Each structure stands twice: as C-alpha cells, then as structure tokens.
Amino acid sequence: MKTALKIAYVGTNFYGSQAQPGLPTVESELRKALEEAGAIKLGTKIAMAGRTDAGVHALGQVVAFEQADPKLTAPRIINSKLPKDLWAYARAEVPDDFDPRRHATSREYRYILYAPDVIERRLKECSSRFLGTHDFTNFSSVEAGKYPVRTVTRLDIAKRGDFYIIDIEADSFLWNMVRKIVTALRLVGENKRPDGWIEKMFDPEYREGIPPAAPGGLYLSRVNYDGIAFEEDEYARQRAYQRMLNSFEWHHTIAEIYKEFKDAMK
C-alpha cells in the first residue's frame, strides 16, 4: 500500500511545487521531512496531484508515496520536520497503483482578485462563457504535445468588498490556464475587451497573447477522487489553524499600515 497526504502551503517562499536543484520547493521540503521522519526510504518517488508555480498556494494538494513505516506518515509527525508555511493535515491508505494526478476526477482552484474598478455584472456575465468544453490554447502557456481542450464544469464568482472570489473546477488544467482566465475576466469586466471576445479567443487559429494574473492570488483548493477516504489529523489541523491565525493578525496589521501610508501619499 501507499500513503496519500493532503497538504497545504503558502507558496510565497517556494519556487513552485516540483523539485528544482538548489531551490526551496514544496517537493524538496516535503521529501526532506519524510526522510528525516523515517516515513520513506531515500530516493522514494513522491507524486503530486497538480503542479503549482512559484508563488502559488495550495489548501488541498495531494501527494502519494510508498511508505517505509505507516506509523511514521501521520501528519503531526511529518509537520514537526516541515517549515511553518507547509503542512500536512489528512492521510489515506491507497493502492500501490494510485497516482494522485491520473486518478483525480477533477481539480478546483480559487483566485482572490483585487479589482475595485471591475463592473460586477460584466464579470459575471463573462464567466458563464468559459463553462463547457473548449480549446484553451489562448488561455494557457504553450506546452509541446499537450492537448489544449479542457472541460470547465464550474466557474463561480462572489464579491467580497473590493475583492472577487473566483472558483473554477475542471477535469484538468493547462499551464497558467486559471491565471489567464482571470486576466480575461478582468479585461472584460473593466470594459477593455468587447462582447464576443471570449468566443473569439476559443478559436485556436486566432492568436492573442494575454499575461497570466499574479500568482499570489491563486491557490489549489481541492482535488477530487472516487473511493479515497482521507482521515484528518485534528491535532495537525489545530496547530495549522493557530499558525494561520497568528499570520493573519500580523498581515492584517501590515495591510492597515500600507493603507494609511497610501492615503498619506495621495
């Protein structure tokens, strides 16, 4: 049997999820922690449900590996070896052939967009056009050999003050697909692109490059599977909650200072 873990991380200090020589990544820090805890043997492959780029976060990333000792794969044990911005909080026993990427039925991302000048009605009208099966060549960064057709099953937008909370679910995603969709939504919402532009962008013969939205607003919220039951580690969750509460208080204070400095410089 293998072990699957649900992990979360604040991606600000990581150079993405995949290992890169000489750089701090989610995979490299997790591997070091698992090896130090005795949960895996040296060189054991660690598979992830999805790749996240530098600066992108995750709340529901899933990793799987062949365990050396099941008792040592408990989230609370692994977390004692991890940096404070990366933690595990749930665990499942999975079959030897389980692949967290290939066996996922869908993935869900959330983007938190600060956009006080967006017209809410246009943003929400535009969002429905992404639903269904489309060619997302113009809404992704080109990867050689990647089939560009994807099916978006859900795209919800909720307003929270000057922020828009954008939730998107699909069978799978192309590189930078979510962040480029967010850019497109914003362009339409700010009246910088006309009606019908989204449909035009779905034509792979038409090419218009748009930049991806900033990575810091994006996180992988959930990966869905059939027949996999994760058991949450309540102690690990509570420790993570307390760390997040402390960080929230600090960053909320800094945000207020930035606001006062901004107002003073008007």
Curated annotation (Swiss-Prot):
Catalytic activity annotation: uridine(38/39/40) in tRNA = pseudouridine(38/39/40) in tRNA
Gene3D superfamilies: Pseudouridine synthase I, catalytic domain, C-terminal subdomain, Pseudouridine synthase I, catalytic domain, N-terminal subdomain
UniProt keyword list: Isomerase, tRNA processing
Enzyme Commission number: 5.4.99.12
Top-level taxon: Archaea
Molecular function GO terms recorded: RNA binding; tRNA pseudouridine(38-40) synthase activity
Pfam hit, one: PseudoU_synth_1
Membrane-crossing segments per the record: none
Enzyme class: isomerase
Coiled coil: none
GO terms, biological process: tRNA pseudouridine synthesis
Residues binding substrate: 109
Location of the active site: 53
Alphabetized NCBIfam families for the sequence: hisT_truA
PANTHER family, sorted: PSEUDOURIDYLATE SYNTHASE (PTHR11142), TRNA PSEUDOURIDINE SYNTHASE-LIKE 1 (PTHR11142:SF0)
Annotated function: Formation of pseudouridine at positions 38, 39 and 40 in the anticodon stem and loop of transfer RNAs.
Similarity annotation: Belongs to the tRNA pseudouridine synthase TruA family.
Protein name as catalogued: tRNA pseudouridine synthase A
UniProt organism field: Methanocella arvoryzae (strain DSM 22066 / NBRC 105507 / MRE50)
Lineage, opening ranks: Archaea, Methanobacteriati, Methanobacteriota, Stenosarchaea group, Methanomicrobia
Gene from which this protein is expressed: truA
